[in-house]
Amino acid sequence: MPKLVVVTREGEESVIEAETGLSVMEVIRDAGIDELLALCGGCCSCATCHVFVDPAFNGLLPDMSDDENDLLDSSDHRDDRSRLSCQLTMTDELDGLTVTIAPED
């Protein structure tokens, strides 16, 4: 099982065993980290699951869709590491992926 490293807004780090096939958002939610709101439940329609992804994993992530890009444009905290965690599916190749929960807008 791949591991997902989640850093909260306060800098607290958790290492979570992630089931492959689940989205990063689902893994974080199922681990009880309630800082990630994910109000739409993973439908790519709210941007409340915004995370900053370790750039070392960029080549392993799927391309960003136009919808994801448009939603992230609405965030005051968007940067080059920004992704919506509902759009990232855990795979064995993503073992050790580190994401930091973005500040609330």
Curated annotation (Swiss-Prot):
Report keywords, A-Z. 2Fe-2S, Electron transport, Iron, Iron-sulfur, Metal-binding, Transport
The note on cofactor binding and number reads: Binds 1 [2Fe-2S] cluster.
Q: Does the keyword tRNA processing apply?
A: no
Q: Please state every residue range assigned to the domain named 2Fe-2S ferredoxin-type.
A: 2-105
Q: Which cofactor does this sequence's record say it needs?
A: [2Fe-2S] cluster
Q: Keyword Lyase: yes or no?
A: no
Indicate which residues the UniProt annotation says bind [2Fe-2S] cluster.
Answer: 40, 46, 49, 86
Transmembrane segments annotated in the record for this chain: none
Query: What SUPFAM superfamilies is this protein classified in?
Result: 2Fe-2S ferredoxin-like
**Pfam family example for this protein?**
Fer2
Q: Which InterPro entries match?
A: 2Fe-2S_ferredoxin-like_sf (IPR036010), 2Fe-2S_ferredoxin-type (IPR001041), Adrenodoxin-like (IPR001055), Beta-grasp_dom_sf (IPR012675)
Any one GO biological process? P450-containing electron transport chain
Q: Please list which residues make up the signal peptide.
A: none
Q: How does it assemble?
A: The chloroacetanilide N-alkylformylase multicomponent enzyme system is composed of an oxygenase component (CndA) and an electron transfer component formed by a ferredoxin reductase (CndC1) and a ferredoxin (CndB1). In vitro, chloroacetanilide N-alkylformylase assays in which CndB1 is substituted for CndB2 demonstrate that the two enzymes possess nearly identical activities.
Give the protein's function. Answer: Component of the chloroacetanilide N-alkylformylase multicomponent enzyme system involved in the degradation of chloroacetanilide herbicides (N-alkoxyalkyl-N-chloroacetyl-substituted aniline derivatives). In vitro, functions as an intermediate electron transfer protein.
What's the family? Belongs to the adrenodoxin/putidaredoxin family.
Q: What is this protein called?
A: Chloroacetanilide N-alkylformylase 2, ferredoxin component
Organism from which the protein derives: Rhizorhabdus wittichii (strain DC-6 / KACC 16600)
